[in-house]
Amino acid sequence: MMKTILPICLALTAIGTAAAQSAKQAPAYAPSAKPSYNAPFTDPANVARDLARIDASMNATFSFQGDFVQVAPNGAVSKGKIWLQRPGKVRFEYDAPNPLLIVSDGVTMVQNDRDLETFDRVPLSATPLNYFLKENINLANDTEVIGLRKMPGQWIVTARDGSGQQEGAITLVFNSETLALQTWIIADDFGGATRVQLSNLAYNGQIDPGKFILREDSNRRRRRN
């Protein structure tokens, strides 16, 4: 099967799901087959338990909105607003002069270049984002976790698509105390990496459903006016 290679502007949305501000103790976790965890795992004996805690924290977050800063592989910096609602919905609205708007309605992810008036689509299920916008997030089952480093103030998880259909890897950086998602990094197979840092997040509030609808005709009319 042909591998899915996503544009970097779509790949940056791979892991949009935020953790709750305060994490609750996860229930006992007993995987059916115990995997073998080696370096770069700093606490290999407790990886299953730690992943279960991260899952529980992310599953406790059904929505958030706030700010993001993106650093592209070439060092270019973009800022903007993010809205996320599980399952399946996310919106990245870039500040000018970046013309991009990226929206998932739960089925399809659309990238709109507001200068060129172009719309590029990819099924949400074909992106790594699908794993982390699910109604029930389970990192151990849904991805191949290839690293979990517990550092002072941070837990750093690296995962990739276990099926081999998607290129690259994703690194998630969590606050070690609250397990709130702070940063994610998308690494591609060409040595490039895109970093997205989240800030000023408000969790589990109501979000206007229209944020996750992208209509081509209305956007074009708005641009011409």
What are the functions of these language-model segments?
Residues 17-53, 216-225:
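Compositionally biased, proline/threonine/alanine/serine-rich low-complexity intrinsically disordered stretches
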